[in-house]
From Swiss-Prot:
<dbReference type="GO" id="GO:0000400">
    <property type="term" value="F:four-way junction DNA binding"/>
</dbReference>
<dbReference type="InterPro" id="IPR012340">
    <property type="entry name" value="NA-bd_OB-fold"/>
</dbReference>
<keyword id="KW-0227">DNA damage</keyword>
<comment type="function">
    <text>The RuvA-RuvB-RuvC complex processes Holliday junction (HJ) DNA during genetic recombination and DNA repair, while the RuvA-RuvB complex plays an important role in the rescue of blocked DNA replication forks via replication fork reversal (RFR). RuvA specifically binds to HJ cruciform DNA, conferring on it an open structure. The RuvB hexamer acts as an ATP-dependent pump, pulling dsDNA into and through the RuvAB complex. HJ branch migration allows RuvC to scan DNA until it finds its consensus sequence, where it cleaves and resolves the cruciform DNA.</text>
</comment>
<dbReference type="GO" id="GO:0005524">
    <property type="term" value="F:ATP binding"/>
</dbReference>
<dbReference type="GO" id="GO:0009379">
    <property type="term" value="C:Holliday junction helicase complex"/>
</dbReference>
<feature type="region of interest" description="Domain II">
    <location>
        <begin position="65"/>
        <end position="143"/>
    </location>
</feature>
<dbReference type="GO" id="GO:0006310">
    <property type="term" value="P:DNA recombination"/>
</dbReference>
<dbReference type="InterPro" id="IPR010994">
    <property type="entry name" value="RuvA_2-like"/>
</dbReference>
<dbReference type="InterPro" id="IPR011114">
    <property type="entry name" value="RuvA_C"/>
</dbReference>
<keyword id="KW-0963">Cytoplasm</keyword>
<feature type="region of interest" description="Domain I">
    <location>
        <begin position="1"/>
        <end position="64"/>
    </location>
</feature>
<keyword id="KW-0233">DNA recombination</keyword>
<dbReference type="Pfam" id="PF07499">
    <property type="entry name" value="RuvA_C"/>
</dbReference>
<feature type="region of interest" description="Flexible linker">
    <location>
        <begin position="144"/>
        <end position="149"/>
    </location>
</feature>
<keyword id="KW-0238">DNA-binding</keyword>
<dbReference type="Pfam" id="PF01330">
    <property type="entry name" value="RuvA_N"/>
</dbReference>
Amino acid sequence: MISSLSGILEASGKDWAVINVSGVGFRTYMPASSPALIGELGQRVRVFTHLHVREDALNLFGFGTAEELSLFETLIDVSGIGPKLGLAMLSAMNAEALASAIISGNTELLSTIPGVGKKTASRIVLELKDKITKSWEAGVLIQVTEANSDILATLTALGYSAGEAAKAIASLEDITGMPLEERIKLALNYFNNK
């Protein structure tokens, strides 16, 4: 129904933004990183939107890119995943990392997202692995393999999000055969060098 909004960014919070389009302010719920990425207050912005209609509410979900919107709409097609959980998933990991985890069948990484258990992660992979186009693989994707999932677990236990941890792991050079402690130190260096 409303596929995008183009207007002035009037206000924003952690996971929402108000976009003024010709005098009407539309509150859009967004992944946690999106309000800061779309622009500064008072600037003209454009967001791609999904209107979710419920019996008691109309909720507008906004995204900085069409790819994010597409992934969101694909996620909420999975049984048991509503728009709030879909948004939480895109808040925990960027779209590329999330698509990569689904394509590679990495249920362990998916289950680190708050609200996604092992069963839900398995259902997501089962239902979406073939639906998500291979165009996601053309970009720079973050692959977390079983060989370095222990680093992922350590970094998330230290308070980093699954997306941040996956980026740190992806930045590592050849780490095969390296002791776990060394691999963790190298991953932590990623955050020190940011």
